[in-house]
Every structure is written in C-alpha cells, then in structure tokens.
Amino acid sequence: MAHLPSVTADGESVLFISDESGLPLPWAVPGRGGTASPLWSGSERVGSIHASPTGPEAIISVDAGGNEHWQLARLDLGERGKSVHPLTSDPQVIHVPGKWAKEGGRYIYASNARDRRFFDIHELSLGAPHASRVLLTGDATHDVVDVAPGRLLVARANTNLDIDLLLVEGDRTVHLNPHPGEVTVQAAAFGVDGVYAAANPDRELAGLLRYRPGSTRHEFVREFAGELELIRPSPVSSSLLLSVNRQGWSEVHLFDPSTGEDRVFNSGPKGVVESVSWYPDGSAFAYGISSVGGLQLYRRDVQTGKEKRLAGPASTPKPVSPPMIRQFLAEDRVAIPYWEYPPGGPARGTLVWVHGGPESQARPGFAPALEFLVGEGWRVIAPNVRGSTGYGRTFTHLDDVRLRMNSVRDLRDLAHELIRQKKAEPGRIGIVGGSYGGFMVLSAISTYPDLWGAAVDIVGIANLVTFLERTGPWRRRLREAEYGSLDTDREFLASISPLTHSDAIETPLLVIHGKNDPRVPLHEAEQIVTTLKGRGRKVDLLVFEDEGHGLVRRENRVIAWERASEWLERELATPHA
C-alpha cells in the first residue's frame, strides 16, 4: 500500500504513507522515481503526512491502538538525520490534520480540546516553544479545507451531507454558501479568481462552482458526467486539477476556467483517485490511486500526459480481475447498482459484501479483505443499496431514518436476483460487511434469515440506541441526522435494531472487532454475541487488542481474513435454511 502523496518544497521527493513494514508509516521516494525508503519506524500507525511548503520537514498524525485520537508531530527531514518531535500530547483530544500556511512555520488544524463534541480551528506555530491559538470556534464540527496568505477556508458540518463553507480573514468570518435546505460540499480551494467548490446546490450531483472575491453568490462553472469530488489548483496557473466520480471510477481532468479548456487524462491505471499533490513548479503532480491489487503512487507530467509509477505493490499473490458494474431492479422498481468480482476459476460460492457509511459507495478501489476472498475462489457481489452516495441526492436520501429498512430489503432483492441468475442458492449465500455494513449484515440475517448461509460482521452496529449512546461524543449529532434522534426516535431505533430481532437469527455468525473502536464500541459486538450464545446459536467473536474501527496491522488482517474465509467455507458447505 502506498498513498497520500505530499511533494516536498524542492520537488525532489514525494512523501507518502506505506504499510510495507506491516503498519502504515511515513516513507519517501525520489520525485522522478527511484527506490522508496522509510522515514520513521514507529510502533503506532501514521494517518497522514504533509510536507512543509518551505523546508525539509513534515507534519504527521499518529494515534494509539487504532483509537483515532490523533496527535500531531513534526518530522525533521534535514541532513543530520530524520527525527520526530511531538507537537500535541493530550491522548483524550483528537487533532485533525489540516494544512500548512503557505509561508511555512505555521500549521492549521482542527481539535476538540475545548469540548469533546465539537471541533475548533487552531493555528500551531512551529517556533520554539510551540504555541497554539484558536482561530475559529463554535458548537459544530469544523474542518480545514484550504489556506492562503491571510485567508482560511473552513467546512462546517451541519450533517454529513449539509456543509457550510466559511471564509476566515483575521477576525472576520463570512458564510460563503448560505443556502436553504441541504448542500453537500465535496471539496473546495482558493483559485486565482475566487473560491472554487465541488457542491450540489439545486442539483443531484456536485459540479464546479466559483465564489468571486467579496461575493457569497456562486457561479456555476462546469457540470460533469458524474460527481466532482476533488479540486487542486495549479501552483503556477489558473488551471484546476479535478477528479470526477463516474459510476465509481475516477476520471482526472485538468480544467482552465479562464479559457474553458478541459483535458481528460485517460491513460494509466483505472481506479479511485484518493489524493493529489502538485510539484512546486506545476510541471507534474503526484497522485494516489486505489485500484484492484493495491494503493499505488504515480507521477503525471502535465505537458506530455505521461505517467510514471512511484511506489506501491508491484504484484499480488493471487491477482484479482477488476469488477464489472451491473444493476437490478428492487421490488419498488428502484435501480440498484452492484459490482461483481469474478474468481479466477469456478466459484467456491457467492458472497454479498455490504459497504459502510451509509453515506458512502462501493467503488472499484483497493479492498484487501474483499480481494482476499475473491483470491480464495469466492464470487463477491458489492451492492450500492439505496442510501449510497455517488448516484445523486435523491438516491442518497432513500434510506433516511424511517426508510432505513428499505435498504435492507434491497439485500433481499439482490439475493433473489442472484438466485434467478443461478449464481446462488437460497440458504447458501454468504454476507459480509463492516461498520454500517455490519449493521446491514445483522439486519439481513435477522429479517430474511432463510436466504443467508453464513455471515461475517466486522465492527458493526447491533443496537442503534446503544450505538448512539456510546459512540464518540463528536459523532453523535452527525449520526443522529442519518439514523434518527435518541430524543425523538428512540422507540423506532430500538424497533429496527438487529439485537431486538436476534431471536430470528439462525445464520452462523462470525463477529470481528477492534477493542479500541471509538466509532462503534466493542459493546456492540459483545451484546450480539452474548445474546446469540444464550440462545444456542452458532456465533464466534474475534477481538483484536491493538485495533480500532477496522484492521490496519497486516498480521491482524491475515488472521481475520483467513478466519473469515474458513468460516464461510465451512458454513456454506451445506444450506442452513
């Protein structure tokens, strides 16, 4: 895995995160290609790396045991050797990585130090001694979007799908996008002639908007055949590097708003572009792409359009073919897209893989557990049930609150479609999902138990009430907007929780969880396992002491995925319906 590229100030190196050692840590590779080398050998994962715009240093974020309580540190890349110097040290506080000030010496980030429920914007001075001051506060979740001399662009989340864009200039804060209803801002950045945003006011999918200096009225600049999700202005011109989500695949554009010229880079690997970093002279950019087989880094020359691979896995033990996009009609005639991953030979069986979120999307990027199962001979089907993103705001809201179980019904209809296609048999379909996808797994086997022969729940929700009560306080408000409020919807939330209907579960269930999960606490796994064991059901629990919301350590992944494959193979050998 190699991702999150950050080009150094001199353009001579690209810093990135790699799990080559078995744990995500900072690495570097020569800017024009060469041998990659580690920068630090810590014992905890590094979540991000941002190269200084002026000198040989970077800011990294580190947590402990997967708890997501990120601490910031300065990584010295000078000639005397590489060393790490902590900048924050409160393990109870989350420090969300942000952006360097353009002149260097200052780093802007978000933190919930004042109140664990909310994130304020802070400025950290890297002089000695290190000093931090608050730039923006309020009872909301704020995130750093972009930084320019004397200006700061901040996103304020009302919900995960309703974002206020704030322009901060000294003591003055301007709400750039006042709007009725809901507007999702996928990305934003300072351009040469204003602020550019990927947003969806009065439309289904996000397009390119511009806010001229001194104005809070947007101009709609460009619409794409998909959803705009990334904006990176050139450091030397008016051009914008853009990434568009087209039915899950990323399409990279170099668009100049001043002329309307739009170049599409069609060559190179196909997948999901997850991050981009310009070289300082604007001649090239480094990008991380997630595709079947791994996360890789490439350098693309702007003039020639040619790409060069910088880092990432050269090959995989059991290569997996790219998935095919298909769709079926649900009972109410809603079109449900899904990806089909074919095994290399005759299928051992069919598995349904449910993504998390729910405001997310199954895409043809790197999915290590899914690809492991495909490599083991399973046909894997990854649906985008109603409520998924990437298909417009109407589709995304089809599972809100009281509509929640309609998305579970989509899994039933998908199973029937697979049976109709003779790709599965009733009672012999496996179902796997993580996080919210784990909730969907538990809901599917408790609502339609006759369809599923085996299930794997990874860091999933068993009870929406206890989940909302125990999830990190910074998450509850945003999660209630999607699921329903404990104050007004408690009875309903309990009524649709899988734990409430656990007496209907007959499907053998493997539950995998991290002890330090701050999003979906371990209690969710423990209560469904305890309840099912008390009823004499076939259930097992695998807990990792040094993991959080998902598995990041390679040795843990190997244990978990091999265990899951063995569980599925054994339980799907004969039908349980």
For each feature predicted by the language model, list its residue ranges.
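The conserved beta1-alpha1 loop
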Residues: V354-G356, H513
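Conserved beta-strand scaffold positions in the cores of enzyme catalytic domains, especially
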Residues: A36, I325, V380-A382, L541-V543
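Active-site-proximal cap/loop segments of hydrolase catalytic domains
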Residues: V385-A577
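Conserved beta-strand elements of the Class I
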Residues: L15, T350-V352, L510
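Peripheral, non-catalytic segments that deliver or gate enzyme domains
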Residues: M1-P346, P358-E376, L403, E417-R420
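A fold-wide structural signal in alpha/beta-hydrolase
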Residues: T350, V374-N384, D540
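Local beta-strand N-terminus motif with an aromatic residue
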Residues: R348-G349, W452
